[in-house]
Amino acid sequence: MSTVEPNAYDPQQVETSAQQFWDATRAFQVDENSDKPKFYCLSMLPYPSGALHMGHVRNYTISDVVSRYKRMTGHNVLQPMGWDAFGLPAENAAIKNKTAPAKWTYANIEHMRAQLKSLGYAIDWSREFATCTPDYYVHEQRMFTRLMRKGLAYRRNAVVNWDPIDQTVLANEQVIDGRGWRSGALVEKREIPQWFLRITDYAQELLDGLDQLDGWPDSVKTMQRNWIGRSEGLEIQFDVRDTTGAALDPLRVFTTRPDTLMGVTFVSIAAEHPLAQHAAKSNPELASMLETLKHGGVSEAELETQEKRGMATGLTAVHPISGEEVPVWVANFVLMGYGTGAVMAVPGHDQRDFEFANKYGLPIVQVVKLREPRNDDEQAWDATQWRDWYTDKSRELELINSAEFDGLDYHGAFEALAERFERKGQGQRRINYRLRDWGVSRQRYWGCPIPVIYCAKCGAVPVPEDQLPVVLPENVEFAGTGSPIKTDPTWRQTTCPECGGPAERETDTFDTFMESSWYVARYTSPNARDMVDRRANYWMPADLYVGGIEHAILHLMYFRFYHKLMRDARLVDSDEPVTNLLTQGMVIAETFYRDADNGGKDWINPADVEIQRDERGRVVGASLIADGQPVHIGGTEKMSKSKNNGVDPQAMVAKYGADTVRLFSMFAAPPEQSLEWNEAGVDGMARFMRRLWVQVHKHVGEGAAALDVASLSAEQKAIRRKTHETIGKVDDDYGRRHSFNTAIAAVMELSNALAKFDDASAQGRAVRQEALEAMVLLLNPITPHASHALWQVLGRGETLLENVPFPQVDAAALVRDALTLAIQVNGKLRGTIEVAADAAREQIEALALAEPNAAKFLDGLSVRKIIIVPGKIVNIVAG
């Protein structure tokens, strides 16, 4: 008998050996020529920021576990990887490091690829691409020119955040307290020409398609439904008059609550609305207000939270029923880019209008009441106190103060008003969507050039396909003020492809969501001359997509939309890009800080802190290792640079090995829940890996034997039963439930049972061999390096374990010779008995009545009946 010390497990040596074998055999390179069922498993591609974080590790490990499991269950599995390489962070890094964004990006890709490989992911690297290369973005340029010709891509003015110092457009998150994040300048709202894709043409299809996505989380589908925001209402015309009473262009407003029309006391328009601009020409005070409102937010979240501000324009709108004139106000919560840039204001039944009206002393009228109020609060109506029922149309309502419409409910009023307006040509029924067309222009350098040429004679002309790609110059000096291609006349100036006259290229670049909206299809045919080829229809739709729920709306909406564009271009056959979606939770960690001199907080990395915990593992004290002095405990939060609570995956792999890091990231929490990083937990996984290593080597030292199931003892049968119960559970946890933490726990239980199984006989060793082989294969999707090595130690040779079939349950092994039954007296547990699996009812009843503890509780009682739940419980009813 040989003994192996725990430190004999050398993760670095084991992992290097396995990875060399996989590389040499091109183990995970796949093609479409297979009679196996396909399985396409995909993680959301990373941005090459320079280093992996633990969120990446968790995401890609989930995908890898599923991919390896599917290979072992006989599937032809594609798991690719690429780089979402355009975007703002590269520009910021270029400014900071005084380098070209391209150089910074490609260096990061090299580093992060090496990090991914060190974690042992079963990736087909032959399909790798970066979205910033012309070989990739030429296809989206070609698609865009085709969409232009079909009318699905168009150009119009749109409001953006403009930094007047840096002369560039800012994303909403780059505006801090109304100022540019870098220059500190007051940000303006400015209208500039932008390119759009008509996603609204697909709004209903995007909505209907959600009903077919049974493998997507309900939470994601709900968010998409709300974002698409289908609503049925009326579009109503309000005539407009200026201060002299002269007629101006009428306003058209959309409302889902025409029943509240008689409660309109003013009309709100956006600061950029043509009527506001017209009124400002003769009103300097209004012109000043419009200039001020240019510095407000443009996102919906900002509109909800910012102070309501506005000013009367001096114009009036004519109520389409009463004929009364109501004032037209500019309001900062109305956006020109949403609907018509005008809304009918019903302060009695809309909270935003209510707040605005109270601030500026505008009339507030009740025109709806509840037919069956549930309390005094719902009976009362107060123009100075908002109550949620004012806007609730889910209850039985009745119109009041509404002339001939009094007494109607919501539906009756809707139909009556719709009929009236359609008959008089003042309005019409309309289905509206909250979803807006996708603005794809970005006034940035590091992105895919938009393939359009502007000619004074011919207008906007798509670049001919034989002149694509329009290549972005990469060797540039980037200072952050403006774009290098805007100031490069040799790149910008060209000739018109239609008339041959002088022309200029578009200097905007695509929104980076463009690149990530079709990459899933490009992986299927990365060397195709067109966007994709016939191989796409073999792999698409992808079977599993893994990523964060923060992408539920924008990325996943554009992702679905672009796939439908590709379908309509006959590039793919499927309606949806992905069948199943898994949204993993965040990785969180403890935070620690000290108060800074400036009143802020200096965040300290947990690796630099000595932590004291109570018996339940809660942090009760902490001190800085460097000086031994206390630090404040900030609680657990998402790992981030701002809170300095990130953990370097590379350092963890160097310390514990990739398998241990993978094991902990799968064991610490179910995939959909947040994972709290805890190095004590990582230590626990490392101990388990060493114990498994010792178990296998100790067993091999004793020698194996052939299994003879007919001659097994009761104890040997029990271990074999435990082995096959574990196989069944892990198979279900991997394949159906994606419950990797419980799969690991089941294997650990089997390992514990084996540790107590001290049987050195031939059949004892044979049962142990079967159990250890099963454990190695069951863990292979999570700890592939160690499994690769231990499979060889068990005498099975060096092979790709993904080609070894996943263990199968032997139903005969699950049959028990004896059963343990719980004994209840009047429903309360009083003991257990062991009975033969085929014991007769009379025998079970006799043993149950004779069980000592049960007999004690039956003393003096009469047994009325005995209920037996086969294989589980005997309940004695007595009184």
Curated annotation (Swiss-Prot):
Gene Ontology molecular function terms on file: aminoacyl-tRNA deacylase activity; ATP binding; leucine-tRNA ligase activity
Per the record, its GO cellular-component terms are: cytosol
**Similarity-based family:** Belongs to the class-I aminoacyl-tRNA synthetase family.
* Designated gene of the protein: leuS
The principal location of this protein is: cytoplasm
User: Which Pfam families does the record associate with it?
Assistant: Anticodon_1 (PF08264), tRNA-synt_1 (PF00133), tRNA-synt_1_2 (PF13603), tRNA-synt_1g (PF09334)
Q: Which UniProt keywords apply?
A: Aminoacyl-tRNA synthetase, ATP-binding, Cytoplasm, Ligase, Nucleotide-binding, Protein biosynthesis
| SUPFAM superfamilies reported in the protein's UniProt record | Anticodon-binding domain of a subclass of class I aminoacyl-tRNA synthetases, Nucleotidylyl transferase, ValRS/IleRS/LeuRS editing domain
Name it: Leucine--tRNA ligase
Q: Where is this motif: 'HIGH' region?
A: 46-56
